[in-house]
Amino acid sequence: MREITPKRIREMKGKEKITMITAYDYPSALLADKAGFDIVFIGDSLGMVVYGEPSTLNVTMEQMIFHTRAVAKAVKRALVLADMPFGSYEVSVEEGIKNAIKLVQAGADAVKIEGGYDHRKLVKKLVRIGIPVMGHTGLTPQRYLRLGGYRIMGGTEEEVEEILRDAKALEKAGAFAIVLEFVLADVAKLVTEEVSIPTIGIGSGPYVDGQVLVWHDVLGLYESSPPFAKRYANLKEEILRAISTFREEVKEGKFPGREHYWEFQDKEEFKRIKDNVMKKLNL
Protein backbone atom coordinates (compact mmCIF):
# COMPACT_ATOMS: atom_id res chain seq x y z
CA MET A 1 0.00 0.00 0.00
CA ARG A 2 1.23 3.46 -0.87
CA GLU A 3 1.80 6.01 1.89
CA ILE A 4 -0.93 8.41 0.76
CA THR A 5 -4.38 6.84 1.00
CA PRO A 6 -7.91 8.20 0.49
CA LYS A 7 -8.26 8.25 4.28
CA ARG A 8 -5.13 10.40 4.53
CA ILE A 9 -6.50 12.78 1.89
CA ARG A 10 -9.75 13.16 3.83
CA GLU A 11 -7.85 13.92 7.01
CA MET A 12 -5.97 16.75 5.28
CA LYS A 13 -9.13 18.86 4.86
CA GLY A 14 -8.72 22.19 6.60
CA LYS A 15 -5.26 21.25 7.88
CA GLU A 16 -2.90 20.93 4.94
CA LYS A 17 -3.30 21.86 1.28
CA ILE A 18 -3.62 18.84 -1.01
CA THR A 19 -1.37 18.79 -4.08
CA MET A 20 -2.33 16.92 -7.22
CA ILE A 21 -0.82 16.77 -10.70
CA THR A 22 -1.48 14.72 -13.80
CA ALA A 23 1.01 12.20 -15.14
CA TYR A 24 0.51 9.88 -18.07
CA ASP A 25 3.72 7.86 -18.30
CA TYR A 26 6.44 6.22 -16.20
CA PRO A 27 9.09 9.00 -16.21
CA SER A 28 6.58 11.77 -15.49
CA ALA A 29 5.07 9.77 -12.64
CA LEU A 30 8.52 9.10 -11.18
CA LEU A 31 9.20 12.84 -11.06
CA ALA A 32 5.76 13.71 -9.67
CA ASP A 33 6.18 11.19 -6.88
CA LYS A 34 9.71 12.34 -6.13
CA ALA A 35 8.49 15.96 -5.98
CA GLY A 36 6.17 14.98 -3.14
CA PHE A 37 2.71 15.37 -4.67
CA ASP A 38 -0.11 13.86 -2.65
CA ILE A 39 -2.02 12.61 -5.68
CA VAL A 40 -0.70 11.56 -9.10
CA PHE A 41 -3.63 11.63 -11.50
CA ILE A 42 -4.04 9.82 -14.80
CA GLY A 43 -6.62 12.16 -16.26
CA ASP A 44 -8.61 11.68 -19.43
CA SER A 45 -7.01 14.99 -20.39
CA LEU A 46 -4.37 12.69 -21.91
CA GLY A 47 -6.66 12.55 -24.93
CA MET A 48 -5.90 16.19 -25.64
CA VAL A 49 -2.33 16.68 -24.37
CA VAL A 50 -0.91 13.27 -25.33
CA TYR A 51 -3.02 12.15 -28.29
CA GLY A 52 -3.97 15.50 -29.81
CA GLU A 53 -7.74 14.99 -29.61
CA PRO A 54 -9.96 18.10 -29.62
CA SER A 55 -11.70 16.96 -26.42
CA THR A 56 -11.68 14.14 -23.87
CA LEU A 57 -14.69 12.41 -25.42
CA ASN A 58 -12.68 9.99 -27.57
CA VAL A 59 -10.55 8.58 -24.76
CA THR A 60 -11.05 4.83 -24.33
CA MET A 61 -10.83 2.49 -21.37
CA GLU A 62 -7.96 0.74 -23.11
CA GLN A 63 -5.97 3.98 -23.18
CA MET A 64 -6.72 4.70 -19.53
CA ILE A 65 -5.68 1.18 -18.49
CA PHE A 66 -2.47 1.41 -20.53
CA HIS A 67 -1.42 4.72 -18.98
CA THR A 68 -2.55 3.75 -15.49
CA ARG A 69 -0.27 0.70 -15.59
CA ALA A 70 2.71 2.85 -16.55
CA VAL A 71 2.08 5.44 -13.84
CA ALA A 72 1.33 2.88 -11.13
CA LYS A 73 4.68 1.17 -11.69
CA ALA A 74 6.49 4.44 -10.97
CA VAL A 75 4.61 5.77 -7.94
CA LYS A 76 5.64 4.49 -4.51
CA ARG A 77 4.30 7.21 -2.17
CA ALA A 78 1.47 9.26 -3.70
CA LEU A 79 -2.10 8.14 -4.20
CA VAL A 80 -2.62 6.99 -7.81
CA LEU A 81 -5.95 8.27 -9.15
CA ALA A 82 -7.36 7.21 -12.53
CA ASP A 83 -10.12 8.88 -14.52
CA MET A 84 -13.19 7.00 -15.70
CA PRO A 85 -13.43 8.06 -19.36
CA PHE A 86 -16.58 9.10 -21.17
CA GLY A 87 -18.77 6.10 -21.97
CA SER A 88 -17.26 3.86 -19.29
CA TYR A 89 -19.97 4.37 -16.67
CA GLU A 90 -22.91 6.26 -18.20
CA VAL A 91 -24.76 3.22 -19.60
CA SER A 92 -25.24 1.37 -16.32
CA VAL A 93 -23.97 1.08 -12.77
CA GLU A 94 -22.84 -2.47 -13.51
CA GLU A 95 -20.70 -1.38 -16.45
CA GLY A 96 -19.22 1.41 -14.34
CA ILE A 97 -18.25 -1.08 -11.65
CA LYS A 98 -16.62 -3.42 -14.19
CA ASN A 99 -14.56 -0.59 -15.67
CA ALA A 100 -13.55 0.80 -12.27
CA ILE A 101 -12.31 -2.66 -11.31
CA LYS A 102 -10.17 -2.73 -14.46
CA LEU A 103 -8.47 0.53 -13.47
CA VAL A 104 -7.81 -0.74 -9.95
CA GLN A 105 -6.38 -3.95 -11.40
CA ALA A 106 -4.10 -1.75 -13.54
CA GLY A 107 -2.71 -0.16 -10.37
CA ALA A 108 -5.02 2.73 -9.44
CA ASP A 109 -5.73 3.35 -5.76
CA ALA A 110 -8.93 5.24 -6.59
CA VAL A 111 -11.02 6.40 -9.54
CA LYS A 112 -12.48 9.78 -10.47
CA ILE A 113 -15.95 10.18 -11.91
CA GLU A 114 -17.29 13.33 -13.58
CA GLY A 115 -20.68 14.39 -12.32
CA GLY A 116 -22.29 14.16 -8.93
CA TYR A 117 -25.98 13.71 -8.23
CA ASP A 118 -26.64 11.73 -11.42
CA HIS A 119 -23.98 9.16 -10.52
CA ARG A 120 -24.51 8.93 -6.78
CA LYS A 121 -25.68 5.29 -7.00
CA LEU A 122 -22.51 4.25 -8.83
CA VAL A 123 -20.31 6.10 -6.35
CA LYS A 124 -22.09 4.45 -3.43
CA LYS A 125 -21.72 0.95 -4.90
CA LEU A 126 -18.06 1.45 -5.77
CA VAL A 127 -17.30 2.60 -2.25
CA ARG A 128 -19.21 -0.38 -0.84
CA ILE A 129 -17.08 -2.86 -2.78
CA GLY A 130 -13.89 -1.12 -1.72
CA ILE A 131 -13.05 1.23 -4.60
CA PRO A 132 -12.46 4.80 -3.38
CA VAL A 133 -14.02 7.50 -5.56
CA MET A 134 -13.24 11.15 -6.16
CA GLY A 135 -16.11 13.14 -7.61
CA HIS A 136 -15.95 16.04 -10.06
CA THR A 137 -18.38 18.91 -10.53
CA GLY A 138 -18.41 22.43 -11.93
CA LEU A 139 -17.06 22.35 -15.46
CA THR A 140 -17.16 18.69 -16.45
CA PRO A 141 -15.25 18.38 -19.75
CA GLN A 142 -17.00 15.14 -20.72
CA ARG A 143 -20.23 17.17 -20.80
CA TYR A 144 -18.87 20.32 -22.38
CA LEU A 145 -21.28 20.06 -25.31
CA ARG A 146 -24.27 20.27 -22.96
CA LEU A 147 -22.63 23.10 -21.05
CA GLY A 148 -22.13 25.15 -24.20
CA GLY A 149 -18.36 24.79 -24.35
CA TYR A 150 -15.54 25.30 -21.88
CA ARG A 151 -16.65 28.16 -19.64
CA ILE A 152 -16.56 29.23 -16.02
CA MET A 153 -19.37 27.79 -13.93
CA GLY A 154 -21.41 29.05 -10.98
CA GLY A 155 -22.58 32.38 -12.33
CA THR A 156 -26.30 31.73 -11.95
CA GLU A 157 -28.52 30.53 -9.12
CA GLU A 158 -29.29 27.36 -11.06
CA GLU A 159 -25.61 26.55 -11.55
CA VAL A 160 -24.76 27.20 -7.90
CA GLU A 161 -27.63 24.94 -6.87
CA GLU A 162 -26.48 22.17 -9.24
CA ILE A 163 -22.85 22.36 -8.11
CA LEU A 164 -23.77 22.29 -4.43
CA ARG A 165 -26.28 19.49 -4.97
CA ASP A 166 -23.62 17.46 -6.78
CA ALA A 167 -21.12 18.02 -3.98
CA LYS A 168 -23.55 17.03 -1.24
CA ALA A 169 -24.63 13.95 -3.18
CA LEU A 170 -21.01 12.87 -3.64
CA GLU A 171 -20.32 13.41 0.04
CA LYS A 172 -23.36 11.34 1.03
CA ALA A 173 -22.46 8.57 -1.44
CA GLY A 174 -19.05 8.17 0.19
CA ALA A 175 -16.66 9.98 -2.14
CA PHE A 176 -13.40 10.86 -0.39
CA ALA A 177 -12.88 14.16 -2.27
CA ILE A 178 -14.31 16.35 -5.02
CA VAL A 179 -12.70 18.19 -7.92
CA LEU A 180 -14.18 21.64 -8.54
CA GLU A 181 -13.26 22.71 -12.05
CA PHE A 182 -13.49 26.27 -13.40
CA VAL A 183 -15.96 27.39 -10.72
CA LEU A 184 -16.24 30.98 -9.48
CA ALA A 185 -14.13 31.25 -6.33
CA ASP A 186 -17.09 32.35 -4.18
CA VAL A 187 -18.98 29.22 -5.15
CA ALA A 188 -15.96 26.99 -4.58
CA LYS A 189 -15.60 28.52 -1.11
CA LEU A 190 -19.26 27.83 -0.37
CA VAL A 191 -18.95 24.20 -1.44
CA THR A 192 -15.74 23.74 0.54
CA GLU A 193 -17.46 25.04 3.67
CA GLU A 194 -20.58 22.94 3.16
CA VAL A 195 -19.00 19.50 2.67
CA SER A 196 -16.92 17.48 5.09
CA ILE A 197 -14.69 16.03 2.36
CA PRO A 198 -11.81 17.86 0.65
CA THR A 199 -12.33 19.97 -2.44
CA ILE A 200 -9.56 20.12 -5.01
CA GLY A 201 -9.74 23.07 -7.35
CA ILE A 202 -8.62 23.64 -10.89
CA GLY A 203 -9.33 27.20 -11.93
CA SER A 204 -11.58 27.63 -8.89
CA GLY A 205 -9.64 30.02 -6.68
CA PRO A 206 -7.76 29.72 -3.38
CA TYR A 207 -10.56 28.79 -0.99
CA VAL A 208 -10.48 25.06 -1.71
CA ASP A 209 -8.62 22.30 0.12
CA GLY A 210 -6.16 21.57 -2.68
CA GLN A 211 -5.10 22.31 -6.23
CA VAL A 212 -4.55 20.27 -9.39
CA LEU A 213 -3.01 21.22 -12.73
CA VAL A 214 -2.15 19.37 -15.91
CA TRP A 215 1.51 18.33 -16.30
CA HIS A 216 1.88 19.91 -19.74
CA ASP A 217 0.45 23.24 -18.56
CA VAL A 218 2.76 23.42 -15.53
CA LEU A 219 5.81 22.75 -17.68
CA GLY A 220 4.84 24.97 -20.61
CA LEU A 221 4.96 22.25 -23.24
CA TYR A 222 2.39 23.89 -25.53
CA GLU A 223 1.95 27.37 -26.97
CA SER A 224 -1.31 27.89 -25.14
CA SER A 225 -2.88 26.63 -21.94
CA PRO A 226 -6.13 27.25 -20.04
CA PRO A 227 -6.46 30.75 -18.53
CA PHE A 228 -6.41 29.35 -14.99
CA ALA A 229 -3.16 27.42 -15.47
CA LYS A 230 0.17 28.87 -14.34
CA ARG A 231 3.35 28.02 -16.24
CA TYR A 232 6.22 27.19 -13.93
CA ALA A 233 8.64 26.49 -16.79
CA ASN A 234 8.93 26.94 -20.54
CA LEU A 235 10.09 23.45 -21.44
CA LYS A 236 8.79 23.73 -24.98
CA GLU A 237 11.62 26.12 -25.80
CA GLU A 238 14.18 24.09 -23.82
CA ILE A 239 13.18 20.87 -25.55
CA LEU A 240 13.13 22.51 -28.98
CA ARG A 241 16.59 23.94 -28.35
CA ALA A 242 17.95 20.57 -27.25
CA ILE A 243 16.59 18.48 -30.10
CA SER A 244 17.52 21.16 -32.67
CA THR A 245 21.09 21.13 -31.38
CA PHE A 246 21.16 17.33 -31.67
CA ARG A 247 19.95 17.53 -35.27
CA GLU A 248 22.52 20.21 -36.14
CA GLU A 249 25.39 18.25 -34.59
CA VAL A 250 24.44 15.18 -36.61
CA LYS A 251 24.30 17.22 -39.82
CA GLU A 252 27.68 18.82 -39.05
CA GLY A 253 29.34 15.57 -38.00
CA LYS A 254 29.88 16.74 -34.42
CA PHE A 255 27.86 13.91 -32.90
CA PRO A 256 28.79 11.36 -31.82
CA GLY A 257 31.92 12.74 -30.16
CA ARG A 258 34.82 10.50 -29.21
CA GLU A 259 33.36 9.99 -25.73
CA HIS A 260 30.16 8.52 -27.17
CA TYR A 261 31.48 5.44 -29.02
CA TRP A 262 34.02 2.63 -28.68
CA GLU A 263 36.51 1.02 -31.07
CA PHE A 264 38.74 -2.02 -31.15
CA GLN A 265 41.92 -1.24 -29.23
CA ASP A 266 43.81 -3.86 -31.20
CA LYS A 267 43.42 -2.86 -34.85
CA GLU A 268 45.31 -5.94 -36.05
CA GLU A 269 42.81 -8.14 -34.22
CA PHE A 270 39.94 -6.28 -35.87
CA LYS A 271 41.60 -6.71 -39.30
CA ARG A 272 41.90 -10.46 -38.69
CA ILE A 273 38.24 -10.72 -37.65
CA LYS A 274 37.09 -8.60 -40.58
CA ASP A 275 39.06 -10.66 -43.11
CA ASN A 276 37.65 -13.91 -41.73
CA VAL A 277 34.08 -12.62 -41.75
CA MET A 278 34.37 -11.25 -45.28
CA LYS A 279 35.76 -14.57 -46.45
CA LYS A 280 32.98 -16.59 -44.77
CA LEU A 281 30.33 -14.35 -46.34
CA ASN A 282 32.02 -14.36 -49.76
CA LEU A 283 32.26 -10.58 -49.73
Curated annotation (Swiss-Prot):
Q: Which cofactor does it need?
A: Mg(2+)
| EC number in record | 2.1.2.11
Keywords per UniProt: Coenzyme A biosynthesis, Cytoplasm, Magnesium, Metal-binding, Transferase
Record text on cofactor binding: Binds 1 Mg(2+) ion per subunit.
> What SUPFAM superfamilies would the database entry show?
Phosphoenolpyruvate/pyruvate domain
Chief location category: cytoplasm
Q: Which residues participate in 3-methyl-2-oxobutanoate binding?
A: D44, S45, D83, K112
Q: Which GO terms describe its biological process?
A: coenzyme A biosynthetic process; pantothenate biosynthetic process
Q: Where is the active site?
A: E181 (proton acceptor)
Reactions listed under catalytic activity: 3-methyl-2-oxobutanoate + (6R)-5,10-methylene-5,6,7,8-tetrahydrofolate + H2O = 2-dehydropantoate + (6S)-5,6,7,8-tetrahydrofolate
Q: Does the keyword rRNA-binding apply?
A: no
Alphabetical list of Gene3D superfamilies matching this protein: Phosphoenolpyruvate-binding domains (3.20.20.60)
Q: What class of enzyme is it?
A: transferase
Could you tell me which pathway this protein works in?
A: Cofactor biosynthesis; coenzyme A biosynthesis
Q: GO molecular function, one example?
A: magnesium ion binding
- Which cell locations does it reside in? Cytoplasm
A Pfam short name:
Pantoate_transf
Where does this protein hold Mg(2+)?
A: D44, D83, E114
Query: Cell membrane: is it a keyword of this entry?
Result: no
Q: How does it assemble?
A: Homodecamer; pentamer of dimers.
Q: Which NCBIfam families match?
A: panB, PRK00311.1
Q: Known HAMAP family for this protein?
A: PanB
Function, as annotated? Catalyzes the reversible reaction in which hydroxymethyl group from 5,10-methylenetetrahydrofolate is transferred onto alpha-ketoisovalerate to form ketopantoate.
* Protein name per its UniProtKB record: 3-methyl-2-oxobutanoate hydroxymethyltransferase
* Organism from which the protein derives: Pyrococcus horikoshii (strain ATCC 700860 / DSM 12428 / JCM 9974 / NBRC 100139 / OT-3)
